[in-house]
Amino acid sequence: MDLRTHLLAGHVIPAQPLALDRNRKFSEKHQRALTRYYVAAGSGGLAVGVHSTQFEIREPQHNLFRPVLELAAQTVRAELAAAPRDFALIAGICGQTKQAVAEAELALSFGYQAGLVSMAAFKTEPEDVIVAHVATIAKLIPVVGFYLQPAVGGRVFSYAFWRKFAEIPGVVAIKM
């Protein structure tokens, strides 16, 4: 599958929510059901480990980032085995560069085709530092930029920033 062509075709790629049981614990059974639903509904892909799945899944006390990414990838592969079609698996990628590189490598190991890169970890850093960060990630995995609005914890970026961002080889889209 050519990812850029797939994205330009205008597919719906929902952000997967995190399924919890009545005790607020991760429910693998319900998480699989959500993934199967999105595939059966005809979505063009799935964004996993992003805002709807909760950033907190990365925290050591939860330690759910790896299992959530792996489960979604396994379930998508199993569902598409019977009726193959193009489907974009996009992993959320967060944190400063060291963490983001590790998350990108993990996503690639599970067969994800792109990373939705959050820049929320860069609260005050110069824009050129953030561009360099994204360029580092884009060398590993195709990047979907993620703009977090200031009203929900993001920051304003200049036109020059977005211009440089869009020129990074490996950036395939920007979610706004």
Predicted regions and their residues:
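Active-site/ligand-binding-proximal alpha/beta "capping" segment
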Residues: 163-175
